[in-house]
Design a protein with these regions (language model features):
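...captures the hydrophobic TM-helix bundle architecture rather than a specific catalytic motif
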Residues: 1-262
């Protein structure tokens, strides 16, 4: 049985079935990310003055990732336009660049995650707080490359200053005896509210990037045979996957300033 409106637009909506479906799906995605964005904003606005961490993320790296995603959206459009003109070779080049951009984005984000999981904060029993990258850790001592946090600046400000300095290659090696440690932890999701929502938002977004790349990769390689038999339907598949990719890009354009700049 043939499914109607797989290629031609529906009479009631002016869209073919897949396009109707993707827009409905994206509407649910807007609600998902909208709820998370709202949670972040409420937590940020409700935090006491000087208590919300700032400057913990690498803005240049975030900027590079933003440019990578924007570039990938451009190549998605160029690839779809190439198919509309019947130029499959150009489409393949553009879509390959898109997939490379997706891999670059995930790779850069993985580097950021690694940096957070190897960056530690240590609180000693006498109340001192140290912040820096982990050099070594054993049963007797922990060695960090970083700084002691200046409590006079306020908790959040002191952490920010130490965090920035250690990322800049400054600081010194600090040896802390295990017996003197009251609390130790990295800047992973469990560190505080900020890192928790940072990993939730960026992790969920990264999963969408990976999912979108897998779909586009399937259409480009194993599913390419449809271009020879049903070129118009194949072009529609590319358009639908492209709409999802533009949504992923749009989410990051909101994420970047909210998390990295504000």
């Amino acid at each position: 049985m043939e499914i109607p409106y797989t290629v031609e637009p529906r009479r009631d909506t002016g869209l073919y079935n897949a396009k109707v479906g993707i827009w409905l799906f994206l509407a649910s995605e807007v609600m998902l990310f909208g709820a998370l964005f709202s949670s972040y904003i409420l937590l940020r606005v409700g935090a006491d003055i000087g208590e919300w961490p700032q400057g913990l993320l690498n803005v240049p790296i975030g900027t590079v990732n933003t440019l990578v995603l924007i570039s990938s959206s451009v190549t998605v459009v160029l690839g779809w336009a190439a198919l509309k003109q019947g130029n499959f070779a150009k489409y393949r080049i553009c879509q390959t660049i898109t997939l490379l951009c997706a891999c670059a984005f995930v790779g850069i984000k993985s580097y950021e995650y690694y940096d957070k999981f190897t960056h530690y904060q240590v609180i000693t029993k006498d109340g001192k707080v140290f912040d820096g990258h982990l050099v070594s850790k054993n049963k007797d001592q922990v060695v960090l490359h970083g700084f002691e946090i200046d409590a006079s600046k306020g908790k959040a400000a002191g952490v920010t200053a130490a965090h920035k300095a250690s990322h800049g290659g400054h600081g010194k090696e600090i040896e802390i005896k295990t017996a003197e440690i009251q609390k130790i932890g990295n800047y992973g999701p469990a560190h505080n509210t900020y890192t928790s929502i940072y990993f939730t938002l960026t992790g969920l977004h990264a999963l969408h990037v990976i999912g979108g790349a897998l779909v586009m990769g399937y259409i480009l390689f194993p599913g390419a045979g449809m271009w020879k038999t049903e070129p118009e339907r194949y072009t529609n598949r590319v358009e639908v996957s492209g709409l999802f990719w533009h949504f992923v890009d749009l989410v990051w354009i909101f994420l970047f300033p909210v998390l990295y700049l504000l």
